[in-house]
Amino acid sequence: MNTLAASAAAHAQAVQSLDSIGITVSDMQRSLDFYTKVLPFESVSDGEVTGEAYEHLMGVFGLRLRVVRLRLGQEFIELMQFLAPRGRPIPVDSRSNDRWFQHIAIIVSDMEQAYSHLRKHNVEHASTGPQRLPDWNPNAGGVKAFYFRDPDGNHLEICQFPPDKGDPRWHGKSPLFLGIDHTAIVVADTETSLKFYRDTLGLRIGGESENYGPEQERLNNVFGARLRITALRAPAGPGVELLEYLAPRTGRPMPIDTKANDLWHWQVNFRAADTDAAAAAVRSGRYDYVSSGVIALPDAAFGLHRALMGRDPDGHAVTFIER
């Protein structure tokens, strides 16, 4: 076995699951009202941290951080409010093809009913309305989807799978909001991203498609959108979906000075059996660290003992955690 294959195999064993998706927010109470009242997430834990260990983990000096862990179905998100220092807002002209774009795909049992529910709560549209992807596309035909925004402007998606697509548990008739299938990120080049997520982290490809046409344009609200989509999976948990815009190539890169307290910051939290092995795999691929190294966390706050944050080739944050 060559060195790259050995590294990939070792790290594939170290990454046990996609534990959660972290989202930075500006006002925790406002966000909780949205995620638990407009959407039916349930609060699992709520706490604050400060101190040197968390500064070195998050790459933000002088932080005081509140984290609320929420559950929908079997999946988890973590809302993060930096009480200090405050970060920057999402650019008002953000588009779905900018490379800081990330969303979670919430599966619903009835698209029309879910959309009506969101309309009653006056959610901000990111799509023109729900779209049904055309049947000529064998890997996506029949999927219904709609993009909207949370109070900070973060993109979210509701999605309904037809009977022949998606995990069997997404075909239930109730509840209306079933869980999170994946988080999607915009990437500049799929092959470059696969070297990170597949070859270094050990995720497997679960499906691929090329989507275009008026339905896709209106879903993303990007004229002329043509996407290469690659679905990836860890051994457990929701997936990671790579979105490469083959057209238009006008999406802007992740700001090089992005910090975890900036409101466009999301992070994919992978549970690892050994964060040292994860760190070695990231370092072997010459990918960037956010953390100063693997950080031992005092008092096992949030049930975490050790953690490391790095960045993928496009600057999306990835965290390896030991619980």
Predicted regions, residues:
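A charged, solvent-exposed segment within the mature domains of Sec-exported extracytoplasmic proteins
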Residues: 140, 150-152, 160
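A cross-kingdom feature marking solvent-exposed beta-strand/loop segments within repeated
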Residues: 47-64, 84-102, 119-121, 126-144, ...
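Core segments of cupin and vicinal oxygen chelate
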Residues: 24-75, 113, 120, 136-141, ...
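N-terminal beta-strand motif that seeds the catalytic metal site of vicinal oxygen chelate
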Residues: 2-30, 45, 101-106, 159-194, ...
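Short secondary-structure capping/junction motifs at helix and strand boundaries
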Residues: 111-117, 124-128, 155
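Fold-core signature of tandem repeat domains
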Residues: 18, 39-41, 76-79, 148, ...
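Vicinal oxygen chelate
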Residues: 17-26, 64-79, 84, 90-118, ...
